[in-house]
């Protein structure tokens, strides 16, 4: 409900693949990835038109159930934390891989770009981008690769219309 009645927007929350939160990890053990983990994605639906989009700021891996959910979507905002899994280690700014932190990489055979390749999603926008990610640089080869694959890179003040 909005302040003056129904908002005309419905929100459906659903589990996305994730690792367990740090406070639930067992010391010295790989926490692994759960297909229905402790992270959520949202489908936001305009009740009047039926148009919708997905908002998934954190996702550990692309799974078949997630592929089925997103196939043919008009718009997906998706986890773009890292370009490559070992990015923070290679740059000397962290000691964990993206996977260890519960984030799928943009690139690679198991990355988001490859994972969305055959889903028929009309518009794909990377969000939640770490400051170590070279895709943030307009003239980087990584940015060119992402855009050539049909992805947009979110930016402060970006407005999106369905």
Q: Language-model segments: what does each one mean?
A:
Residues 1-69, 156-162:
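Core dinuclear metal-dependent hydrolase active-site scaffold
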Residues 37-39, 48-52, 60-158:
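Cap/insert and terminal regions of metallo-dependent hydrolase folds
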């Amino acid at each position: 409900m909005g302040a003056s009645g129904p908002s005309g927007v419905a929100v459906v929350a659903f589990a996305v693949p994730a690792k367990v939160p740090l406070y639930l990890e067992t010391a010295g053990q790989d926490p692994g990835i759960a297909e229905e983990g402790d992270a959520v994605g949202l489908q936001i639906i305009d009740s009047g038109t039926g148009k919708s989009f997905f908002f998934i700021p954190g996702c550990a891996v692309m799974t078949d159930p997630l592929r089925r959910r997103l196939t043919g979507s008009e718009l997906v905002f998706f986890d773009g934390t890292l370009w490559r899994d070992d990015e923070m280690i290679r740059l000397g700014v962290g000691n964990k891989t993206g996977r260890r932190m519960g984030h799928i990489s943009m690139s690679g055979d198991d990355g988001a770009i490859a994972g969305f390749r055959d889903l028929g999603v009309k518009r794909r926008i990377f969000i939640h981008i770490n400051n170590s990610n070279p895709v943030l640089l307009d003239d980087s080869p990584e940015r060119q690769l992402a855009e050539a694959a049909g992805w947009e890179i979110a930016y402060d003040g970006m407005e999106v219309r369905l």
